[in-house]
Amino acid sequence: MSATTTSASETSTPTCLPIPPKENGYVPPGGCGNIHMYEASFAAPVLFSVLFGLTTIIHIVQAIMFKKRYAWVVIMSSLWELIAFIMRSLFAKNQSSDAYNTPFTIFFLLAPIWVNAFLYMTLGRLIYFFLPSGRLGGIGAKRFGHIFVWLEILAFIIQLVGAAFTTDTEASQETIMRGVHIYMGGIGVQELFILIFTGLFIHLQRKMGEMERHGTLDAEKVGRGSMPWRWLFYAIYASLFLITVRIIFRLAQYADGTNIDNPALRNEWFEYVWDAAPIFICLAILNVAHPGRVLVGPDSEFPRVSRKEKKQRKREKKEAKIAEKEAKKERKRRRKHGSIGVDLLDAQERGSAPTSRPAPGGHGYQGENQRTWYDNRGNEVRP
């Protein structure tokens, strides 16, 4: 999130000074067209572009090598970071241009969410692979991933809305601060989900450790991996810790708003040390301790449903729904006729008529129109 001191609307008023920009486009605070309270470095974003580019390439290779389709999620995180720092490098040469600063801000702020989603999806696969029941805490493995990913999408949307407010060059200071508060709320929600997820992960580790002690943990599955399964847990804990460090920094950075005396807004290195570096280390850890080194084999992934099977299931669901509707209609029809009409309805369905006989007491009938019908219990039925 850029430490904007003046917006476009403010630059048209006498509150900003017509200070000529430097060769790289930088305008000091108070000058018309200023974006940051510091002069952005060129070397730092180039360095991080290289670092995130390397981890992106490695993650792509590992996704293919370990046959982990869901690894596209973590690739998105490193790719967004790469795009962010390419934009930052371009901005460093033209520091009065929002065309580079806005995409940098959005990609930089939102990229870590993809790492969270990847870890959540890994939890579901660990449950499915190692627990015979495929459940943890009464919840199915696949549902775990779905629940946390949707929660992460919620946090993503909140943060995106906040980031959009702060990058609006026409926004007032009040609007920018509203965006800051929305974004802080989004990362606060994200941290809450991380804490819940960490608790579940600890529960899974204890359960697997207990199974291992009792000899019920599948030794064949454990033996497939190229590293101990506990290493993956430690890597995930380290990743969650680094993401939490980054969240705490962001909360502290804007706790006092966009105060010009805030050192976190006046010094560029804060964002590199407490945001860019932790996320890079997190991605590098997942390169070293990739889930694909533990989750080995076709049974380490959720079963894939073919298009033909999906159509068949859809058709079966549709047929079941139609059958259920017909059953409901039948039940309503039977309730409407009451118990005395059950035999009559059954007879009609079989294509036969119910028994007709003279009325009790010797009274018969004289014509078809005056015929009286009775069911097997002797109750009169009016067809």
Curated annotation (Swiss-Prot):
What factors induce this protein?
Expression is positively regulated by the aspercryptin cluser-specific transcription factor atnN.
**Region Disordered, annotated ranges:** 305-383
Q: Any stretches that span the bilayer, and where are they?
A: 46-66, 71-91, 104-124, 144-164, 182-202, 231-251, 269-289
Q: Where does the record say carbohydrate is attached?
A: 94
Describe what happens without this gene: Eliminates more than 70% of aspercryptin production.
Q: What is its main location?
A: membrane
Pfam families on file? RTA1 (PF04479)
Biological processes annotated in GO: lipid transport
The record's annotation in InterPro entries points to: RTA1 (IPR007568)
Keyword Magnesium recorded:
no
Q: Which domain of life is it from?
A: Eukaryota
Q: Which family does it belong to?
A: Belongs to the lipid-translocating exporter (LTE) (TC 9.A.26.1) family.
Q: What does this protein do?
A: Probable lipid transporter; part of the gene cluster that mediates the biosynthesis of aspercryptins, linear lipopeptides built from six amino acids including 2 highly unusual and nonproteogenic amino acids, 2-amino-octanoic acid (2aoa) and 2-amino-dodecanol (2adol). The core structure of aspercryptins is as follows: Ser/Ala-Thr-Ile/Val-2aoa-Asn-2adol. The first step of aspercryptin biosynthesis is the generation of the fatty acid precursors, octanoic and dodecanoic acids, by the FAS subunits atnF and atnM.
Annotated protein name in UniProt: Probable lipid transporter atnI
Organism this protein belongs to: Emericella nidulans (strain FGSC A4 / ATCC 38163 / CBS 112.46 / NRRL 194 / M139)
- Lineage, uppermost ranks: Eukaryota, Fungi, Dikarya, Ascomycota, Pezizomycotina
